[in-house]
């Protein structure tokens, strides 16, 4: 069943929300949003979690990679972390439209 617009209902992400946000802050990331199958309510056991983040001042690509690894450890599944500017033009509008703030 699809999620309501702009609401996050996946039990895993809801349960781990505070820990996810704490990891993001520790790595200099802000404005965490979920997109892809988790945002659309179509996630299954093998789905990865797609996060859209903005890096704060002073944060580096190393921080982005470390955040990705820490999120994978926390959630127990593959995670992709991407900045809005890094989105391919072909999917950019769709991703920005479906992204749900964490």
Whereabouts are the PLM-identified features?
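Catalytic core of pol beta-like nucleotidyltransferases
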Residues: 1-31, 39-45, 56-102
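Conserved histidines in hydrophobic membrane contexts and catalytic metal-binding motifs
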Residues: 34
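Structural signature of FAD isoalloxazine-binding scaffolds in flavoprotein oxidoreductases
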Residues: 53
